[in-house]
From Swiss-Prot:
One of its GO terms (biological process) is deoxyribonucleoside monophosphate catabolic process. GO terms for molecular function: 5-hydroxymethyl-dUMP N-hydrolase activity; nucleoside deoxyribosyltransferase activity. It is found in: Cytoplasm; Nucleus. The keyword Ribosomal protein does not apply. InterPro entries: 2'-dNMP_N-hydrolase (IPR051239), Nucleoside_deoxyribTrfase (IPR007710). Pfam families: Nuc_deoxyrib_tr. Belongs to the nucleoside deoxyribosyltransferase family. This is Uncharacterized protein C191.05c. It comes from Schizosaccharomyces pombe (strain 972 / ATCC 24843). One of its GO terms (cellular component) is nucleus.
């Protein structure tokens, strides 16, 4: 007796759309909701799902400002980062200072420690030492000066004798450097949407190649 064996063809598994945490001082800006909506559309076009910090903060708007509310937000944001496959970070200077938003820097380090792919974007293409130089002049009326010792991460120091570090980087090397070590880069454009578009396109390609 002969016959044809039935071949079981496995069903194709649905493609999982990678989730990307959208981090930055954008949450503090007057048009935050509208801006995140724009960035989410750009994410969709790139083939990923953008997740804003607000997406995990249901009910927070009903809580009174204070330490308890702030800590709750930090807890909820951490849960969102744990769920996401990668992160994209705004490295714009914060509150007219040379450095980026410190909370965003913490989030960047947190996701870097998880080994997740990262990307960055900014509208300010000046190198970090130049940002420090401009800030010191405008805020304190002083200037940078050359260091007498060689080596380290900077050849200049400020009026307080602190090294102006991270030469060759847009921000502190511990932030931009972690992005580079994950395989990404920081995109620069005068338009925040275009800078984001360039960065998310690269991050999406890396994330989708893993799925």
């Amino acid at each position: 007796m002969t016959g044809t064996a039935k071949v079981s063809i496995p069903k194709a598994q649905p493609h999982k759309v990678p989730c990307v945490y959208l981090a930055g001082d954008l949450v503090f800006r007057p048009n935050a909701i509208e801006l995140f909506d724009e960035l989410k559309e750009i994410c969709k076009d790139a083939g990923v799902q953008g997740v804003a910090p607000f997406d995990g903060q249901e009910g927070v708007e009903e809580m009174a400002p204070g330490a308890e509310t702030s800590l709750k937000i930090a807890e909820l944001d951490r849960k969102l980062m744990d769920r996401c496959d990668g992160g994209i970070f705004c490295l714009d200077p914060f509150r007219r200072a040379p450095d980026m938003d410190p909370g965003t820097a913490v989030e960047l380090g947190y996701m870097a420690a998880q080994g997740k792919p990262l990307a960055g974007f900014t509208t300010d293409g000046r190198m970090y030492p130049e940002k420090v130089r401009s800030y010191r002049k405008q805020a304190w009326g002083d200037a940078l000066k050359p260091r007498f010792t060689k080596g380290g991460s900077g050849s200049m120091e400020d009026a307080d004798g602190l090294i102006v570090h991270s030469e060759g980087f847009l921000q502190n090397v511990m932030t931009e450097g972690f992005i580079r070590m994950s395989g990404g880069f920081v995109a620069v454009d005068f338009s925040i949407q275009e800078a984001f578009r360039t960065a998310i396109k690269d991050l999406a390609a890396r994330l989708n190649s893993q799925h």
